[in-house]
Amino acid sequence: MTKFIFVTGGVVSSLGKGIAAASIAAILESRGLNVTMLKLDPYINVDPGTMSPFQHGEVFVTDDGAETDLDLGHYERFIDSTMTRRNSFSTGQVYENVIAKERRGDYLGGTVQVIPHITDEIKRRIHEGAAGYDVAIVEIGGTVGDIESLPFLEAIRQMRSQLGRNNTLFAHLSYVPYIAAAGEIKTKPTQHTVKEMLSIGLQPDILICRMDRTMPADERRKIALFCNVEERAIVGSYDVDSIYECPEMLHDQGIDNIITEQLQLNVQQADLTAWKKIVHAIQNPKHTVKIAMVGKYVDLTESYKSLIEALKHAGIHTETDVQITFVDSENIEKNKGDVSMLKDMDAILVPGGFGSRGVEGKIAAVRYARENNVPYLGICLGMQIALIEYARDVAGLKGANSTEFDLKCAAPVVALIDEWQTADGSVETRDESTDLGGTMRLGAQEVELKAGSLAAKIYGSGHIRERHRHRYEVNNNYVPTLEQAGLVIGGVSAGRERLVETIELPNHPWFFACQFHPEFTSNPRKGHPLFTAFVKAALNNKKA
């Protein structure tokens, strides 16, 4: 029978529930357990696919093509399980399914209510996502006390009642602030958030206290007394330089022993050797490189979370401190293509994105990298931008652009593909009036790499599988012209469309761009060959 750990948060949002939950999962996995994780989001959006990155941060794409919360990226980076669409759902999805059942008559004319119909659907989805695992860690988004979270909290209250204390555990994160003016740690917010939980029938088994300093013993005793939690189950989650220090930090306080005892799990001792090696590599780099990330969401770096982590992973595996400088492509555009801020950079990266804002600034950055032999990595839109720049400035295609930015451009080298065959053989059609939500090329796709190409050299294989998230594709009608001008198409999709997947420049020290998102499959234990190669290229440029 699967055991459940429910992770909630109180006082304020952005406490790090996802990191705490993933760290617990990593510790339990090191003890020989088969662990999965679920994220339950209280918002009414069906998924975050059409939400602004400034509001939601990154959209993480699973192997099976679900657009999910960025916390699922943390889950995959901390444990070996691959997330699927079953590992994430929102209020919108729950209501959508319940309403569809009502319309079909599944409820036999009964009155459809939050309890039991909505809560039953939530429980059904939790059990579905947890099936086949020893332990499922379920993170409830939002903050306890929010109206939006109530159906989810009621559902897990029912699960405790139905499954019992030895099969369920509640871990609650709370903020314990230090008031500098008073010189004191304040426990009152934690007392109030636990009171809020008790009012809806939830008693935390573990309290994880987010703090910027070590918790004094007397404050720990005070929290235990007022919150009715064992003193040893008051666990500190302190500010650290790297999130990969968190598993060891929580393990050192015995959190896994508390969990295994309550859930009656007879398992081996934790082995965090791999995590210790990762932390040691982060703390003891031998080299340093500066990489410019030129994008339009740079004011909220959470928009590029997986990408930032993938570069850090490459740093771990090359013993390098990867220093990322975020460059707003709009500023380049406003300053008439001034890229002087890139001159001290060892490499340049243009990430994915949507819309025309800041595009010409990105094109200027690509031009600088190409003309000055600076290592360049383009991802998704970053590949399309590189291709547009090459089409304009090298292949001589005047008016080259993407129809995403200019529907009537003279040379649409990137365009909306209006028809293709999906993995199951059905034909998808798209046009300008198609709904935005769920209408992209999503999830893992097969890619064939050209023998002798930089792509094949990086991956060490002629066939790879990478995750995608985009609507627009390179227009194959222009490929012969671009190839005649020296552009190398190093990878194409394995389907009948033969869509362009990677491009490279043979006469450049290191110039590579891909339509897919390799950052979604990087983790600190293994890294990713593409990012490792990119950081090595930056190191070589630095030495030169």
UniProtKB/Swiss-Prot annotation:
EC number: 6.3.4.2
Domain Glutamine amidotransferase type-1 stretches: 290-544
EC top class named in words: ligase
InterPro entries: Class_I_gatase-like, CTP_synthase, CTP_synthase_N, GATASE, GATase1_CTP_Synthase, P-loop_NTPase
Gene Ontology CC: cytosol
Reaction(s) catalysed by this chain's protein: UTP + L-glutamine + ATP + H2O = CTP + L-glutamate + ADP + phosphate + 2 H(+); L-glutamine + H2O = L-glutamate + NH4(+); UTP + NH4(+) + ATP = CTP + ADP + phosphate + 2 H(+)
Keywords carried by this UniProt record: ATP-binding, Glutamine amidotransferase, Ligase, Magnesium, Metal-binding, Nucleotide-binding, Pyrimidine biosynthesis
GO biological process, one term: 'de novo' CTP biosynthetic process
Regulation: Allosterically activated by GTP, when glutamine is the substrate; GTP has no effect on the reaction when ammonia is the substrate. The allosteric effector GTP functions by stabilizing the protein conformation that binds the tetrahedral intermediate(s) formed during glutamine hydrolysis. Inhibited by the product CTP, via allosteric rather than competitive inhibition.
Residues that, per the record, bind ATP: 14-19, 71
Annotated residues for binding of CTP: 13, 146-148, 186-191, 222
Pfam hit, one: CTP_synth_N
Residues involved in L-glutamine binding: 353, 381-384, 404, 471
Metabolic or biological pathway: Pyrimidine metabolism; CTP biosynthesis via de novo pathway; CTP from UDP: step 2/2
GO-annotated molecular function: ATP binding; CTP synthase activity; glutaminase activity; identical protein binding; metal ion binding
Purpose: Catalyzes the ATP-dependent amination of UTP to CTP with either L-glutamine or ammonia as the source of nitrogen. Regulates intracellular CTP levels through interactions with the four ribonucleotide triphosphates.
Quaternary structure, from the entry: Homotetramer.
Family listed: Belongs to the CTP synthase family.
Name of this protein: CTP synthase
Species lineage: Bacteria, Pseudomonadati, Pseudomonadota, Betaproteobacteria, Neisseriales
